[in-house]
């Protein structure tokens, strides 16, 4: 009960623990909250200009810093793009990206709108990604153009293409965040979408939070 007071609840829980069906237990039953709101929104008034995220990339030799207010903006921009792609509460999204700021934005954006995200390690080959796509059966796959390993550029898009060809339940759309690492990046019309282009179309939108019952999955 003491821990529950550290969380913002849109609707307070009616019961702290329901253990009527062991070994399955439900915590904070009836409470409605949102992980993105607790990670970002609740800090805007008191910590808006405080650093919330620092991403130091050995791949691009850059460091990017975001205050809570800047993080809020980036997450809402990403959430607005997801909504444009008709991703909503309960939909599943697979994220196949390296350690980059946009991976964080994508996870928080999914949580914000109530979509369930699954992060797949970007070191996995196409076959392994295909297996996870079949398990999750996502509405959308989010990826990057490329990453770097030991100084070598690793293009992700060919791996994604191979995975989608092998999967039994591939997503209908692929959202690609390009950092300009792969000069040969090729998008398949009708399936692949460029994040930056979509974000410019959508513009800056404050996306409402989808409040979830405490035991609903966010990831």
Predicted regions and their residues:
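A short N-terminal helical cap/helix-turn-helix that marks the beginning
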Residues: 1-14, 31-54, 215
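AMP-dependent adenylate-forming
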Residues: 17, 39-70, 178-186, 217-218
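Conserved AMP-binding/adenylate-forming core of the ANL superfamily
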Residues: 36, 53-108, 125-130, 190-200
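Generic, well-ordered alpha-helical scaffold segments in large soluble proteins
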Residues: 43, 74, 78-81, 85, ...
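Conserved pre-ATP/AMP-binding loop-to-beta segment of ANL
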Residues: 49-51, 174-177, 186-219
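Alpha-helix termination/capping residues and helix-transition junctions
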Residues: 87, 135, 168, 211-214
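Alpha-helix capping and helix-loop boundary segments enriched in small/acidic/polar residues
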Residues: 94-101, 120-124, 148-151, 208-211
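Structural core segment of the AMP-binding/adenylate-forming
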Residues: 112-196
């Amino acid at each position: 009960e003491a821990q529950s007071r550290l969380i913002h609840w849109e609707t307070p829980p009616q019961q702290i623990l329901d253990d009527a069906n062991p070994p399955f237990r439900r915590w904070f039953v009836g409470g409605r909250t949102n992980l993105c709101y607790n990670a970002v929104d609740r800090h805007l008034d008191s910590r808006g200009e405080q650093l919330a995220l620092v991403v130091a990339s050995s791949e691009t030799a850059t460091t990017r810093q975001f205050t809570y207010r800047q993080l809020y903006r980036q997450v809402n921009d990403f959430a607005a793009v997801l909504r444009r792609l008709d991703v909503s509460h309960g939909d599943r999204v697979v994220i196949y990206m390296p350690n980059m700021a946009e991976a964080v934005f994508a996870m928080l954006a999914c949580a914000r709108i109530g979509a369930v995200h699954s992060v797949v390690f970007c070191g996995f080959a196409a076959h392994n990604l295909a297996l996870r796509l079949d398990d999750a059966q996502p509405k959308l796959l989010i990826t990057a153009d490329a990453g770097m390993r030991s100084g070598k550029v690793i293009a992700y898009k060919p791996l994604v293409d191979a995975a989608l060809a092998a999967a039994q339940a591939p997503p209908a759309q692929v959202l690609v965040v390009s950092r300009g690492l792969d000069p040969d990046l090729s998008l398949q019309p009708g399936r692949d979408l460029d994040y930056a282009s979509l974000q410019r179309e959508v513009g800056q939108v404050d996306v409402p939070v989808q409040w979830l019952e405490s035991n609903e999955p966010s990831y």
